[in-house]
Amino acid sequence: FASALEEARADLFGLYYIADPKLVELGILSDKDAYKAQYSNYIRNGLMVQTNRIELGRQITEAHMQNRQLIAMWCYEHGQKHNVIGKKVKNGKTYFVVNDFEALRGLFGELLAEIQRIKSEGDYEAGKNLIMRYAVDIDPELHKEVLDRYAALGLKPYGGFVNPEIVPVEKDGQIVDYKVEYPDDFLGQMLHYCHKYSVL
C-alpha cells in the first residue's frame, strides 16, 4: 500500500498547490482559472479514462492508477453532500463534472492531510483501508462503458513522450551555455536510457 499512498501524497500536493494564486503572481500560470482544466482532467481520468487499460473484471493493481482512482473516488464520495463532483448520463454516456472547484481543492487538502498523517504515524490499517475501499475495485458497468467508448476511438491505451536533453556547451573547458536536444524517436530515447542508466 505504501507505493500507492506515496503517489497519492505527491499528486495531492501538486493538485492542491496548482490552484494557489501565487502561481499566477509568479507568472507560472497564465490565468487564475487555469488549474480548473487539470482538476477536471484528473477527476475524469481517475474515475473513468484510465480503466481502459484494464481487462473487464480485473482490479486496479498498479500504484499510479490506484492513486488516481483513490483521489478521484474519495473526493467524489466526500463531496456528494454538496455536489462537488456530479455524475451525469447523457445519451447513454457517463460524464463526471466538477461543479465546485474551490470545494474540490479543499477535499484535496483534506485527503493530503490524512495521507500525510498515515505516512508520518505509520498507520498501516488506515492506509490499507483507504486503498482497499477507494483504489482497487472498478464499477463493472462503468468499466464496460469506458472500454466500449475507447474501442470506438481506435486509440492505444498508453501514450509515450520524448524528453528533451539539456546539453552543456563548452568553450576552452568552461561551460558557457546549454542547448536543448531531442532524441530522433521514442525507441531511441528508451534505448539511450537503458544504455546510460541501467546500472542505477
Regions inferred by a protein language model and the residue ranges of each:
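Active-site-flanking segments in enzyme catalytic domains
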Residues: 1-3, 119
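An active-site-proximal "capping" alpha-helix that borders the catalytic cofactor pocket
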Residues: 3-20
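Mature, folded catalytic cores of secreted/periplasmic enzymes
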Residues: 5, 28-34, 54, 147, ...
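Long, well-structured alpha-helical subdomains associated
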Residues: 15-118
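Non-catalytic terminal regions of proteins
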Residues: 86-200
